[in-house]
Structures are given as C-alpha cells and as structure tokens.
C-alpha cells in the first residue's frame, strides 16, 4: 500500500512539472543579421556572393553539415545523411554510399529523396546550367565527360532507391565530405521546382529542405523561421533569423552599434577579423622564356616590402600562397600549421634588399634582366596602387625598369588564360575551404606554368591515405612555387565583422559563409 502511495505521488509530481513546463514556454529567440548585399538568387548552384551563400546555408540542408570540434577545427557531421560507407575500388577510385534520413522534408511537406541529390549534382555539373561552382565536382567520376559532351547525366551519381545516394570518385578526395557534401552549391534541388522560371527569387516559390523556411523576402531583407518538424530542432539556437540587406559598410556598422542588428558582416572596422579565401600575388609567366633565371625571380620577390603595401588597409602581408582560414586535412588552419614562406619582419627588409641585389648580379645585372612588363587591373584602385608600389620598389632597390600595363578585369583574365603576359598582378580565390582549392590553380593546363614535379606532388597528395602525409605534399607544392620565384605572394584580404555581446559567435567556414543555427544567448556576466 505504501509503495502504491509513493508511486502515485511520483506520478503527480511529474504531471505538475510537465504542466509547469507547458505554462512557461521559452522565449522566442530572434537573431538579426546584416548582410552586405541583397541576394540576386538563392539557387544553390548559382549563389556566389557571401550573402547569397550564407542565406542558402540556412534554408537548405546537404548530406553533411559543418561543426566546430573541441580543438577548434571544422569537421563534417551528419545532416540529411544519417550514415555513409566508403569502398576502395580496384581501379583506384572510391565509391561513397550515403543512407539518407527518411524524415527530412521539403518546405511543401514532401520527403527529400536521393533522387533530389542526383538531380542537383548532375544539374550543377552540366555546362548548360552555367554554374560558377561546377568544378567543385571535378573529383566525381564522369565530370570530364560531362564537360566535353555537355551532358550532366554522365556524372556518376545514382539513387538505387529513395534513400540511398551513391557517388563514385575518380580519385581519393580528402575534402569531399567537408567542402562538397557540406557545401552550399551541392545542396539538394527538386526538379519540379528548379524547372520553373525564377523559382529561387521569391519566398512563395522557393522550395527548401533546411532548418529554416523563408517566410518573407523583399529588397530590404529576408525572414526565416525554424522549420516545423526539422529532425534536429533541439540543437537549433535561433527560432527566427532576420536577414537585413545593406550595401553601405558604415551603415552596417551604425546598425550594429545602435542595437538594430545582432551581427554585421564586412565592416570597415569590427570586433573580429575574419580570414578570406583570397590572395593577391604576382604571377611570373614561365612560358615567356624571359624570366628563366631563378636568381632574377628571387630578386624580384625579395625587393618588395609587403608591410608598406598593406599599411593602413584591411590587408595582411602574405606568408605564402594559401591564406589563413583555408583548412588542412585535419580541419585545422593550413597556414598556421605550415608556417611562413616569406620573411615579413620589418627590421630585415634592407638586408633582404641587399640579398636581392646580389641575386640580380648573379643573373647578369640590370642589363640582362631587361625591361619587365607588369599587367594589372587598372579599374581596381587597390590594384593600381599596388602595381605602382611594386614598380617603385624594383626601381629604387634594384634599378630595374618595369612598365605598367593597365587592363580591364576581363582583359586581365583573358591574358592569364592565354598566357599573354610577362608578370601579372592578380587576386586568386579558392572555390573550396581546403588548401588545395588554391594550389590546384598551378596544375598543368594553365597558360603560365608547367611542372611535372609540381603535378606529381598534387597527385601524391590526392592519393595519400594519411592526413599528415597529404599535408606535407601540399606544403612542398606551395614551397616550390614560392621558393622558385614563379609566384610572389603579396597580401591577404580580411573581413571585419561585429557581434552583439550577448550572443555566441556564428560558425565561420573561412570562405565567406557564416552559419547561425547554433548561436545562443550567453549567460549574463
């Protein structure tokens, strides 16, 4: 009898606790985000700006998603996929088999299936789509055939059933899960939605499968609410995301300081300096034959004062080709792990210039060097200032005459593709978060550099099954370009952002995308 009374009392207490919980629901959490532009599209295959990709990252859900580990590294975790297996094939290829969750829903209530991923990936690779991100799938078997035959169906992805997605890779790819399966360009797309004109331009027609649903969208902003029935709802921080669009940097800063937004990206100044996947550098054209002397190339590199180039600007002197923020194989920072390839110590600059003059003499002196032509984008003010500063440094420190040749951005791009330049000032941008996203630009097939040794290092990195060995190959490849003088890194771009003090920081992936789904309010100090 006493046991029965104790049992009934326990049931009563539990009921009271449940009723108390129902009577006091948690406050709705809204995070207000100020982006630096209004999205022109939210089609995952076409979204290119940081603002577009940031919004896409919240409205869509890929096979995997990014999470920050306890050591600070960025790692992929399961999202629309609940598991996967990897099979090594006898021909050196790999086959990934993903098993999808059966409770991931499109915004109209239909279930997300493997066929949606097949359609999205083949559509992304198809030249007819015109996606700027098609090369992100270059490791998938059949990609080259898709490009040559203009047929997306040749991409070797398949759906044996509604919840099994199979991908065959033509080579091992260490960043496949992180940068492809958790990227924004490869998000699933449903064919009946994407075949409608302008489907991704209005909240009424936008079909998404992510943790948030667009409930309002105009030229000033977009509101997204947590999706009903989202499988991982308990891990979501914000209930509502309010994206505000503001193109003026100072106006974004004023909105943040005035408490009108909780986060603002790309500020003139800010609390946080976020690395960006771009490096401005000088390309020396190997194919012209006029820069064959390694001593001359090294002299040109040593005579440049990177600290002077970046003073007073949101730029950092480059330590190598790969900027901070791009990841190594373990998910850590490649630049931090590999160290600096360039001496930017101000006190050492004059000694470096003396070394440069010695190297120039070894190369035959000023007369042997001849006249150097430097191609640059004259429509870009920063590029024009940089070109003039480099020209002056070579004249003052080495006595070399450089002729500046201005061009439009398109003319510069065409000259690079065709190899019609001697030295070019350009900015390279990674299309993925892995360090190879930049280093692959110097593989055979470009118009300005060829090295079988370099190609072998990148192929060895691709084939390596050991993470430290892969990173060592990539580090050696970067060092070859810089130490041989074919690439002269100048500076990195960084972006300032600001965050309200009461919130935890969003996840920043190093490529310009911010993720707010795990942001929560911090306890009062």
Report each predicted region and the residues it spans.
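Gly/Pro-rich hinge or "lid" segments in bacterial periplasmic/extracellular proteins
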Residues: 68, 169-240, 250
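Surface-exposed binding/hinge segments that line
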Residues: 99, 116-118, 133-191
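Ligand/substrate-recognition segments at binding pockets and active sites
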Residues: 219, 349-353, 358-428
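N-terminal lobe/hinge region of extracytoplasmic solute-binding protein
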Residues: 35-91, 207
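Extracytoplasmic/peripheral linker and loop segments enriched in polar/acidic and small residues
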Residues: 344, 400-412, 437-501, 525
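Long beta-strand-rich cores associated with HINT superfamily self-processing modules
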Residues: 499-525
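Alpha-helical secondary-structure segments
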Residues: 113-120, 162-166, 239-240, 277-325, ...
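Structural transition elements
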Residues: 315-362, 380-383
């Amino acid at each position: 009898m006493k046991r029965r009374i104790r049992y009934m009392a326990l049931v009563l207490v539990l009921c009271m606790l449940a009723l108390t919980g129902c009577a006091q629901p948690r406050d709705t959490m809204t995070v207000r985000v100020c982006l630096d532009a209004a999205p022109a599209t939210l089609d995952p295959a076409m979204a290119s700006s940081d603002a577009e990709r940031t919004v896409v990252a919240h409205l869509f859900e890929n096979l995997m998603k990014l999470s920050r580990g306890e050591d600070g590294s960025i790692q992929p975790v399961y999202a629309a996929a609940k598991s996967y297996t990897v099979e090594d094939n006898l021909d050196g290829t790999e086959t990934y088999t993903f098993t999808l969750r059966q409770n991931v829903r499109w915004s109209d209530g239909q279930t997300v299936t493997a066929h949606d991923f097949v359609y999205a990936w083949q559509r992304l690779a198809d030249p007819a789509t015109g996606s700027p991100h098609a090369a992100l799938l270059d490791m998938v078997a059949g990609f080259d055939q898709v490009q040559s035959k203009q047929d997306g169906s040749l991409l070797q992805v398949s759906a044996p059933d509604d919840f099994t997605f199979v991908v065959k890779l033509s080579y091992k790819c260490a960043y496949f899960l992180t940068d492809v399966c958790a990227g924004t360009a490869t998000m699933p797309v449903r064919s009946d939605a994407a075949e409608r004109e302008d489907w991704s331009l209005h909240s009424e027609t936008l079909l998404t499968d992510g943790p948030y649903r667009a409930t309002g969208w105009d030229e000033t902003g977009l509101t997204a609410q947590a999706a009903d029935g989202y499988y991982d709802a308990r891990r979501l921080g914000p209930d509502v995301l309010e994206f505000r669009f503001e193109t003026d940097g100072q106006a974004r800063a004023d909105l943040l300081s005035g408490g009108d937004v909780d986060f603002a990206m790309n500020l003139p100044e800010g609390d946080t300096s976020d690395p960006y996947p771009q490096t401005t550098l000088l390309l020396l054209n190997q194919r012209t034959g006029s820069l064959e002397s390694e001593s001359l190339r090294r002299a040109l590199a040593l005579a440049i004062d990177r600290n002077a180039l970046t003073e007073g600007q949101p730029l950092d002197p480059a330590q190598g080709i790969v900027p901070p923020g791009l990841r190594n194989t373990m998910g850590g920072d490649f630049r931090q792990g590999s160290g600096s390839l360039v001496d930017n110590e101000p006190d050492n600059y004059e000694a470096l210039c003396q070394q440069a003059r010695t190297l120039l003499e070894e190369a035959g002196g000023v007369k042997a060097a001849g006249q150097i032509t430097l191609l640059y984008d004259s429509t870009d003010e920063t590029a024009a200032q940089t070109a003039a500063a480099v020209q002056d440094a070579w004249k003052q420190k080495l006595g070399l005459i450089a002729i500046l040749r201005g061009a439009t951005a398109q003319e510069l791009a065409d000259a690079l593709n065709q190899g019609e330049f001697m030295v070019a000032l350009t900015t390279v941008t990674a299309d993925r978060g892995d360090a190879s996203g930049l280093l692959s630009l110097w593989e055979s097939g470009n118009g300005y550099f060829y090295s079988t040794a370099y190609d072998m290092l990148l192929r060895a990195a691709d084939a390596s099954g050991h993470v430290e060995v892969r990173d060592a190959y990539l580090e050696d490849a970067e060092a070859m370009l810089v130490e041989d003088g074919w690439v002269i890194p100048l500076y990195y771009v960084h972006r300032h952002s600001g965050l309200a003090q009461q919130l935890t920081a969003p996840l920043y992936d190093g490529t310009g995308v911010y993720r707010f789904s795990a942001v929560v309010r911090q306890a009062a100090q």
